[in-house]
Amino acid sequence: MGQSKSKEEKGISGTSRAEILPDTTYLGPLNCKSCWQKFDSFSKCHDHYLCRHCLNLLLTSSDRCPLCKYPL
């Protein structure tokens, strides 16, 4: 007991591990920026997308988008 040799550590040399990134494919143009639901019909506002339902709601209140302040 106590006379066993410890195992040699095998170092990983020269290989880098893959960086783990969260799955963000559900963000971006696939979702409405106002309600964040996935829909089929989108309208492009200045730098984001709005679904048809949110676009109609926003147009009843103002000519400008409350998210980016550009004209709808």
From Swiss-Prot:
It is found in: Virion; Host cytoplasm, Host perinuclear region; Host cell membrane. InterPro entries: Z_RING-type_Znf_sf, Z_RING_Znf. One of its GO terms (cellular component) is virion component. A zinc finger (RING-type) spans 32-68. Transmembrane segments: none annotated. It comes from the Viruses. Keywords: Host cell membrane, Host cytoplasm, Host membrane, Host-virus interaction, Lipoprotein, Membrane, Metal-binding, Myristate, Virion, Zinc, Zinc-finger. Myristoylation is required for the role of RING finger protein Z in assembly and budding. One of its GO terms (molecular function) is RNA binding. The keyword Metal-binding applies. Its main location: virion. Pfam families: zf-P11 (PF03854). It is a lipid-anchor. A lipid is attached at G2 (N-myristoyl glycine). Interacts with protein NP; this interaction probably directs the encapsidated genome to budding sites. Interacts (via RING-type zinc finger) with polymerase L; this interaction inhibits viral transcription and replication, Z partially blocks the product exit tunnel for the releasing nascent RNA product. Interacts with the glycoprotein complex; this interaction plays a role in virion budding. Plays a crucial role in virion assembly and budding. Expressed late in the virus life cycle, it acts as an inhibitor of viral transcription and RNA synthesis by interacting with the viral polymerase L. Presumably recruits the NP encapsidated genome to cellular membranes at budding sites via direct interaction with NP. Plays critical roles in the final steps of viral release by interacting with host TSG101, a member of the vacuolar protein-sorting pathway and using other cellular host proteins involved in vesicle formation pathway. Belongs to the arenaviridae Z protein family. The RING finger domain is essential for the inhibitory activity of protein Z in transcription and RNA replication. This is RING finger protein Z. It comes from Lymphocytic choriomeningitis virus (strain Traub).
